[in-house]
Amino acid sequence: MRTLVVGAAIVDLMMKVERLPKSGEDIPCKETKTVVGGCAYNVANTLRNLKCEHDLCVPVGSGSFADIIRRGMKEKGYEPMIEEPGEDNGYCLSLVEADGERTFITVQGAECHFKKEWFNRIDMDRYENIYIAGYQVCGKSGEIISQWLKTVPNVEEKHIFLHRDR
């Protein structure tokens, strides 16, 4: 049973800090780490580790963050299904406090601007399962994904998993 994982790949910029700064305050960062993340990317990697057949359908733009994502995908054996040259991918600044509490600041990019024509390239007969990351079903992208699902042949026979982020 093959799964199509639809959603986002973004760059996570993680910074370990003792505590969050007060407004206007400057504090030192103990450690930084840059990794590829995003719900769909993380789910695909879990499926990969479990040896489940799947494809990762995330838009990869053009720019410095898209380049990091493209390299991360290649390292995991993924080829971009969607190339969006007009926009860079987004990133998330994660502030991790000493007690482990995490605070996020997200800059959206190509992964939040789904286009109807992206789905025209996908042979849905290959998939029994469809996983959709919830962050992508918000706003206009959600409308586009919902409209696409209505056009999927035999959609009622497929297992659809929707992950709600918030």
Residue ranges and their predicted role:
Residues 50, 76, 87-89:
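Short, basic and Ser/Thr-rich N-terminal targeting/leader segments
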Residues 48, 85-87, 97:
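A generic structural signal for short, solvent-exposed coil/turn residues
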Residues 38, 64, 140-143:
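Residue-level recognition of alpha-helix initiation/capping sites
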Residues 63-64, 88:
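Short alpha-helical
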Residues 1-9, 59, 70-83, 97-166:
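Ribokinase/PfkB-type carbohydrate-kinase core domain
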